[in-house]
Amino acid sequence: MKNSADITVLGAGSYGTALAISLASNGHKTLLWGHDPVHMQTLAQDKCNQAFLPGIAFPDCLQIEADLAKALAASNNVLVVVPSHVFGTVLEQAKPLLRSDARIVWATKGLEPETGRLLQDVARDVLGEQYPLAVLSGPTFAKELAMGLPTAISVAGTCPTFTNDLVELLHSPKRLRVYANDDFTGLQLGGAVKNVIAIGAGMSDGIGFGANARTALITRGLVELTRLGEALGANAATFMGMAGLGDLVLTCTDNQSRNRRFGLALGKGCDVMTAQAEIGQVVEGYRNTKEVFTLAKRLGVEMPITEQIYQVLYQGKSPVDAAKELLSREKKSETPAQ
């Protein structure tokens, strides 16, 4: 079946829209679908996503499509960019409408709610083994990507041909550098864990602990990510790349990050509900914390920072008490014997 579009993007929030803008700016005919018909009608009329990316005009190659069946019929390349807690639901909706030659990539960062499973497992449960799968991950703020500011990301998947095609589709010499990676598991995990650590970094700064504490937290957060990744069979080197260290540093240090701002509010004394309300958009790290904590417990992986953040978010511990507990842990070597 011939494509009438080069790629269809499912998810018209800030990041989905930004990726669609980037693709269309590359000259690729791009369809953008969202679940809210009223929102989609507004996007089509305004030629801009005023709700999430105000003032950034849509390229001519970007088309708004409110009908999911039409959106999925237009292209065999499908990019899913929805919150992790509805990832499986969106795939369920899409499944009967997918083309037989469909190829699925997602930029969703997170794990399955309650179980802590990787999204590749969710996708396989819903879609079976029929379709090539891939994940896009790395240090990307939606606004900067949509504005065309230089950005770099990584992509990995189950099919090398699909991965290479995505590199060609996404890469732009002027705005977006894309690295191929063969660690499908590692790329997915980095996007979830960095959200958790970013909340911790925000809490630390909100309390007023300073740059030393923030840097220590980021560094030890990277250790926790690597431990968990290795337990799942990921390549430790992945976490020194875009989807690991890159995304971790970005999210922990810049206030464009909702997760960091959420942590800042908590550190300054807000309760969880008030802090979430202040952000006004989905704070993926809130759910991710429970998911990552659940996964770590199931695998027997020590993640003390994640555990303390979990206790703040779900058990009512104060950020100050969480910090005290981390600082009073038993002394140990930074390079334990293997």
Curated annotation (Swiss-Prot):
The keyword Lipoprotein does not apply. The active site is at K194. It is found in: Cytoplasm. Sn-glycerol 3-phosphate binds at K109, G138, T140, K194, D247, S257, R258, N259. NADPH binds at S14, Y15, H35, K109, A142, R258, V282, E284. GO terms for biological process: carbohydrate metabolic process; glycerol-3-phosphate biosynthetic process; glycerol-3-phosphate catabolic process; glycerophospholipid biosynthetic process. Keywords: Cytoplasm, Lipid biosynthesis, Lipid metabolism, NAD, NADP, Nucleotide-binding, Oxidoreductase, Phospholipid biosynthesis, Phospholipid metabolism. It catalyses: sn-glycerol 3-phosphate + NAD(+) = dihydroxyacetone phosphate + NADH + H(+); sn-glycerol 3-phosphate + NADP(+) = dihydroxyacetone phosphate + NADPH + H(+). PANTHER family: GLYCEROL-3-PHOSPHATE DEHYDROGENASE, GLYCEROL-3-PHOSPHATE DEHYDROGENASE [NAD(+)] 2, CHLOROPLASTIC. HAMAP family: NAD_Glyc3P_dehydrog. This is Glycerol-3-phosphate dehydrogenase [NAD(P)+]. It comes from Shewanella baltica (strain OS185).
